[in-house]
């Protein structure tokens, strides 16, 4: 009965206060996504400050991502129980408090504890925005603008992360990587309390919650991320990695089989949402993969620091901001599938344009690929949001938003693991091939290394070969990174096949299965 009543409630008029409340939600999401990139650019600084071993330092990021990806699909359930207002207040309060805890951590374990809390709260803040678009705004221009703001900030945050992290690292102490969240956290918390709609909480739903299905999902997602973390180094079929993937499959299967699962997997019976999640997954691979791959090239090949890397990547962010107003207008009048096809095709081309780099590639050569990716990424996220979530009933929109955002984050995690596998397995192979070319085809080897034939050492001179090994390593990594760019482009281009298979957008919503949690 409560859900039927919820479905009849119309969004309140889009007042200034409502827009302020939605703005607070967007800032919270932006902080959560930005925090990932800000911290990852400065892990070495934190490692030195807290005397944490390099072998354990990666867990500072992994635990955040695990907690985040577990909480994302729970957001729909939590919105129904606590309402958007109180869930946001609780999440932003926890995120801000955990940020303070991270800043004042004194060892590895205290930092991990607060990163877990920070990640769980951050995971709630992300899908909360996309659910709010359809719960707070009626269909029309307001909903389109809200979608654009939320979608733009979601793709802008990873782009600005390296610049922000680099600036903080070079200007302040590592503590400010976390303390930067405090002021906006407090401001948005106050705005959320006073500006977001006041609805009744439904704490009684805790009594009927299927905790077993929650445990299955949590274990499955944690196992998947641990497996993805270890796969590039251990091998994708290594026993421990394969075991993690097996736990993931079994956990998801058991959760789906639960008659009243806490996660509404049955919503994927809606073709629009199912295909939208696939597109979101593909975008996650391309978007997070590109934001990871370009800094990798700049750091390993050009030896740039975080701030310089951030300044180079800023081109993408500027292109995103400049084209956003056009995306708002086009998204209102053009078929969502056609716009998505244009967006993914152009984004794939932008990825492919970066697949021909050399060790001499500089800012000018990296400019236009970034412009293309930045200009069209909005068309990869706004139209899919419109058809994936636009026809879901109000009582299920929050669950659908969780699944949609989970798909993008899973795509990002898998994409980064795939990149690491390509770069760090193919790099040594290319190095061996270049050394062989120095003996067999000096002219070709010199071209790859950016040298003249006269500058190449004699292939029988060990000391001479040692002198060019740094250049060989840079060239081999560049070739491996180029292959990763091509793989990202091919995967992104698969979205065109997905859109073709999808067919016309269908409006009927799936029926709630008998016994399922409404």
Regions found by a protein language model. Give the residues of each.
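Short helix-capping/hinge motifs at transmembrane helix termini and TM-loop junctions
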Residues: 105-106, 138, 195-198, 232-233, ...
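MFS transmembrane alpha-helix packing/gate-lining sites
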Residues: 64-71, 121, 153-157, 319-320, ...
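Helix-loop-helix hairpins in multi-pass membrane proteins, especially solute transporters
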Residues: 41, 74-212, 239
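Hydrophobic transmembrane architecture of multi-pass small-molecule transporters
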Residues: 7, 11, 56, 187, ...
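12-transmembrane solute porter fold
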Residues: 17-41, 50, 54-61, 76, ...
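Hydrophobic transmembrane-helix bundles of small-molecule transporters
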Residues: 148, 170-280, 286, 304-305, ...
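Small-residue-rich packing faces within the transmembrane alpha-helices of Major Facilitator Superfamily
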Residues: 69, 96-97, 182-189, 348-349, ...
């Amino acid at each position: 009965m409560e859900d039927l009543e919820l479905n009849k409630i119309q969004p309140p008029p889009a007042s200034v206060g409502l827009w302020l409340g939605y703005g607070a939600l967007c800032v919270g999401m932006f902080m959560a996504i930005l925090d990932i990139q800000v911290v990852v650019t400065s892990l070495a600084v934190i490692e030195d400050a807290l005397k944490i071993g390099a072998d354990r330092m990666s867990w500072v990021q992994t635990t955040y991502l695990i907690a985040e990806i577990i909480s994302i699909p729970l957001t729909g359930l939590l919105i129904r129980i606590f309402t958007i207002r109180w869930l946001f207040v609780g999440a932003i309060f926890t995120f801000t408090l955990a940020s303070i805890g991270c800043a004042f951590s004194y060892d590895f374990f205290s930092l991990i504890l607060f990163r877990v809390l920070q990640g769980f709260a951050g995971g709630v803040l992300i899908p909360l925005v996309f659910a709010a678009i359809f719960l707070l705004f009626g269909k029309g221009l307001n909903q389109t603008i809200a979608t654009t703001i939320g979608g733009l900030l979601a793709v802008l945050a990873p782009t600005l992360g390296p610049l922000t992290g680099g600036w903080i690292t070079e200007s302040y102490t590592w503590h400010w990587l976390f303390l930067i969240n405090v002021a906006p956290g407090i401001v948005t918390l106050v705005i959320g309390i006073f500006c977001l709609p006041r609805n009744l909480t439904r704490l009684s739903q805790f009594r009927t919650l299927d905790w077993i299905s929650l445990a299955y999902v949590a274990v499955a997602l944690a196992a998947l991320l641990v497996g993805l973390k270890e796969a590039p180094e251990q091998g994708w079929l290594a026993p421990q990695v394969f075991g993690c993937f097996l736990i993931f499959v079994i956990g998801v299967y058991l959760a789906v089989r639960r008659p009243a699962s806490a996660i509404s997997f049955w919503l994927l019976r809606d073709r629009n949402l199912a295909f939208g999640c696939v597109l979101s997954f593909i975008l996650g691979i391309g978007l997070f993969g590109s934001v990871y791959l370009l800094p990798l090239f700049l750091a390993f090949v050009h030896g740039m620091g975080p701030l310089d890397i951030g300044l180079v990547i800023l081109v993408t962010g500027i292109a995103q901001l400049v084209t956003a107003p056009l995306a708002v207008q086009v998204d209102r009048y053009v078929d969502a599938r056609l716009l998505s096809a244009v967006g993914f095709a152009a984004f794939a081309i932008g990825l492919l344009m970066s697949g021909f780099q050399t060790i001499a590639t500089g800012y000018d050569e990296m400019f236009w690929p970034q412009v293309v990716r930045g200009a069209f990424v909005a068309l990869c996220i706004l139209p899919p949001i419109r058809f994936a979530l636009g026809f879901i009933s109000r009582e299920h929109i929050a669950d659908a938003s969780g699944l949609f955002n989970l798909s993008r984050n899973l795509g990002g995690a898998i994409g980064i693991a795939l990149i690491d596998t390509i770069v760090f397995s193919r790099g040594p192979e290319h190095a061996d091939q270049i050394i062989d070319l120095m003996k067999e085809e000096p002219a070709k080897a010199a071209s790859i290394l950016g040298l003249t034939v006269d500058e190449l050492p004699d292939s029988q001179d060990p000391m001479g070969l040692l002198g060019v090994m740094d250049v060989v390593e840079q060239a081999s990594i560049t070739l491996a990174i180029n292959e990763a760019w091509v793989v990202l482009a091919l995967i992104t281009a698969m979205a065109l096949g997905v859109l073709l298979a999808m067919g016309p957008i269908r409006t009927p919503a799936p029926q709630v299965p008998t016994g399922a949690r409404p």
